[in-house]
Amino acid sequence: GLFNQNNSSLARFSFGNQQMVRDYFKAVNRRGLGDTANDMAIYGSKIYVIVNISSTVEVIDFRTGSSLKQIQMLAENGSSRQPRYIAFHKKKAYVCSYDGTVARIDTTSLSIEAITSVGRNPDGICVQNEKLYISNSGGLDYSSGLGVDNTVSVVDIATFKESSKLTVGPNPGKIVAGPDETVYVATRGEDVEAGDYNFVKIDCRTNKVTQSNEKVQNFAIDGEIAYLYNYNYNTQTSSIKMFNLKTEETIRENFITDGTVIKTPYGININPYSNNVYITEARDYTTYGDLLCFNQQGQLMFRLNNIGLNPNTIAFSDKASQSDIDDNDDDKENPLAFANKVWEYRPAPGQFINTTTSAYKEGFTYDDILEEATRRIQQK
């Protein structure tokens, strides 16, 4: 959604029938999500959506799409905590908020059990080795004399108290648990648009912090492989690379191999069931963006157009939801959209049209690919 416009949405795409409901939450619950949905995750039988400006955690029944509870993230004086991101561990949810706190929520009762203080304006959270790692951005202090923060707070889960702060670099944001007891964080510099980004590794056994020369604004990790993306505000161009975390070497400078162009990458997630890479396109930040799915070879498999404003997070499940809603035709993606995509984009040899099969065969012409793709989709 757009900041202060109260127009966040949740889209649902079903791999079974290849249909999308663009505003799924509203269709089921007859109300919107709120203002600036910032993060989302599936844990157990529930979906958790962090709605930043509304200062809520929306808890949704995965099977039906119905809202179970809207948890108000408010301070004792009634002010908004402005939640940002969520992580889970042993039936507890941990939510970091811009007011410098982390809340512990019981995933059964959906009640806030405790609050602990960390650094300034936390903007990311993950779990590793029975500890929480929270990136303290200090982003709201950018224009003040105080400046941005440059630390990651380490919170012992058992005591729910901060045990240490690690200096990682100015304005840390995305933070993810990696292999071999590591945590990785992207630092964004004093001024995000200046491009002073860095990719930082934390060894959780020793708390050693290692800087790299990788320019990273956002990233996702799949085992030992990281997908790193960067956006240059001066040239308004983006780049996405594959990086081996173990060898600390670039696997492929350009992850996308088939010529697909993403103007404004806004989010990146890995499907744990297929290892496909999903990247969202925000376009100009004010019009509906898209979701693109790539295989590990960097080939576009499909694209969902106009899924919502500033799409930022994708969550996956190997189970189908069973909601009774039947959204109108305007809000559904017809399966033929995948075949029609061939008219707009000439695929490279081996281009995948959907998640299971390739429409390309040796010697196929452009028209042959379209015909074969349509035939296979109609058989589904």
Regions found by a protein language model. Give the residues of each.
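Intrinsically disordered, low-complexity segments enriched in small/polar and acidic residues
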Residues: 326, 337-339, 343-344, 354-359, ...
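A detector of low-complexity, intrinsically disordered, Ser/Thr/Gly/Pro/Ala-rich segments
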Residues: 95, 105, 353-355, 372
